[in-house]
Amino acid sequence: MKGNYKLKWHKFTIYFALFTLTAITLFAAVPFFIGKTHAVINSSQIIFNNAQIYAQHPMMQTYDILFGIFFVMYAILIVITRQKLAGFKKDALQLLYTCLGVSVLIPAAYAVTNIVVIGFLRIYFYLIVVSMIAAVILFLIYAVYYGKRKSLFTN
């Protein structure tokens, strides 16, 4: 406990949530680099058809690699944010809110890119929507929680 504040959620965030988010983000980047991002479901089977997509839309491969790089950069931002939160740095909360914003922007930008380049969005649409809703909910939770503890971040 720092001051009169209980910091269980803070400790959960810095010791588990942000490390887990970093691992998930890096794991999510892998398909973009190895060409496993475009799939169709065919009678309970997922079939990746990147070769077909890339043949019809050559720029999509470049976009996929670019988004893989975005995910890696986002993972680095998460680690920096975790370190700043752990040290109660002055800019830590702004970085946390930025991370939550980026977690909405990257999937949204990827969805828009797919719709513009390919003309439609594959099976990941629901995952994108769920991740965006989760980010908004987390933003609200963190805003309330850290809003009450803003005075701790003075370093």
Identify the function of each model-found stretch.
Residues 1-155:
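Topology signature of small-to-medium multi-pass alpha-helical membrane proteins
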